[in-house]
């Protein structure tokens, strides 16, 4: 898929004089001058990282800052992410992306090998969603802006969705939502960066893991361990789907001096943190965890405030990495095409 554009990126600005005719333009290429100016801005706002004691405070109290965030904003800050089904078909009902025969064959295949091993473990140690045939987990679920669209749109009777966040406030907001159903979903508090914390499901049991603007909130020194732990939960053929902040995104360039924790890692005014990735950063993390690249694409988007005649350059990265199959069967699991 290298070089092939994914589903986003269908509105191109060919005539700069038309920039204010739409709210956003996709796949906007930067000039050398823009790239140089962005690099200079990052150098300026990163020249003096915060003292180590302050960095440790933000690390040790990370969940508290996110609790405060969700206490203030509840479910009003983020919009539901219905665009996910266009970008990541793996989150839709399997019947909507496969023929009936293919779907049945995929389910039969999943009962072989690793799936049988998981089911034997189910009998000995039952876990939430043990009887499901397709399991999705979202890490850093917040108040459910990804989880609930999945539950609403994916009617697969074999689906079970896990969602976790290290903010207990966020998890309680998920559980109190009228769309939350324990028969189809299990929400739990979990710090994915803590290697001592255990997951409620066994290894090799998940088909899809979703990371939407989540990995960037984790200390870069802990990211490799996080991805490796998550990789161990995937079935062969399962995948991790990611969308996150890219290097020189508008949000990075807006940071003032005194907010930098480490190279390309910052703390916001509310105490929450954010890292800005390159494609190579993410490729190294996933490949080192034993996963194979299906997609690793930069989404450079020009957002426009037509009322104020302002332009804002956003940079996001979208990835799909797959756990290698243990057999030559390629049906089911995550698509590599």
Curated annotation (Swiss-Prot):
This is tRNA N(3)-cytidine methyltransferase METTL2. S-adenosyl-L-methionine-dependent methyltransferase that mediates N(3)-methylcytidine modification of residue 32 of the tRNA anticodon loop of tRNA(Thr)(UGU) and tRNA(Arg)(CCU). N(3)-methylcytidine methylation by mettl2 requires the N6-threonylcarbamoylation of tRNA (t6A37) by the EKC/KEOPS complex as prerequisite. Monomer. Keywords: Cytoplasm, Methyltransferase, S-adenosyl-L-methionine, Transferase, tRNA processing. GO terms for cellular component: cytoplasm. The lineage of its organism: Eukaryota, Metazoa, Chordata, Craniata, Vertebrata. InterPro entries: Methyltransf_12, METTL2/6/8-like, SAM-dependent_MTases_sf. It catalyses: cytidine(32) in tRNA(Thr) + S-adenosyl-L-methionine = N(3)-methylcytidine(32) in tRNA(Thr) + S-adenosyl-L-homocysteine + H(+); cytidine(32) in tRNA(Arg)(CCU) + S-adenosyl-L-methionine = N(3)-methylcytidine(32) in tRNA(Arg)(CCU) + S-adenosyl-L-homocysteine + H(+). The keyword Oxidoreductase does not apply.
């Amino acid at each position: 898929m290298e070089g092939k554009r994914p589903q986003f990126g269908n509105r191109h600005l060919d005539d700069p004089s038309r920039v204010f005719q739409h709210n956003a333009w996709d796949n906007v290429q930067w000039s050398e001058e823009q790239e140089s100016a962005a690099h200079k801005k990052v150098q300026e706002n990163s020249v003096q990282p915060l003292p180590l004691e302050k960095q440790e405070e933000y690390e040790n109290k990370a969940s508290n800052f996110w609790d405060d965030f969700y206490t203030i904003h509840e479910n009003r800050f983020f919009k539901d992410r219905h665009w996910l089904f266009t970008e990541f078909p793996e989150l839709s009902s399997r019947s909507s992306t496969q023929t009936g025969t293919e779907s049945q064959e995929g389910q039969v295949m999943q009962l072989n090998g690793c799936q049988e091993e998981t089911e034997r473990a189910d009998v000995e140690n039952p876990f939430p969603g043990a009887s499901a045939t397709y399991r999705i987990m979202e890490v850093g679920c917040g108040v459910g802006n990804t989880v609930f669209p999945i539950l609403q749109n994916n009617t697969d009777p074999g689906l079970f969705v896990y969602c976790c966040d290290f903010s207990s406030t966020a998890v309680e907001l998920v559980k109190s939502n009228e769309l939350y159903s324990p028969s189809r979903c299990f929400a739990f508090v979990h710090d994915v960066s803590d290697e001592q914390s255990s997951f409620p499901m066994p290894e090799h049991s998940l088909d899809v893991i979703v990371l939407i603007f989540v990995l960037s909130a984790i200390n870069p020194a802990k990211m490799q361990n996080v991805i490796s732990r998550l990789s161990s939960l995937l079935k062969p053929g399962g995948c991790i789907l990611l969308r996150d902040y890219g290097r020189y995104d508008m949000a990075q360039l807006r940071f003032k001096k005194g907010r930098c924790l480490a190279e390309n890692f910052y703390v916001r005014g509310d105490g929450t943190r954010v890292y800005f990735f390159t494609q190579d950063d993410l490729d190294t993390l996933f490949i080192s965890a034993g996963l194979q690249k299906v997609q690793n694409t930069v989404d450079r988007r020009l957002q426009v405030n037509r009322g104020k005649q302002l332009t804002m350059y956003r940079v996001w990265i979208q990835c799909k990495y797959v756990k290698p199959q243990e057999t030559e069967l390629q049906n089911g699991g995550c698509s590599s095409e």
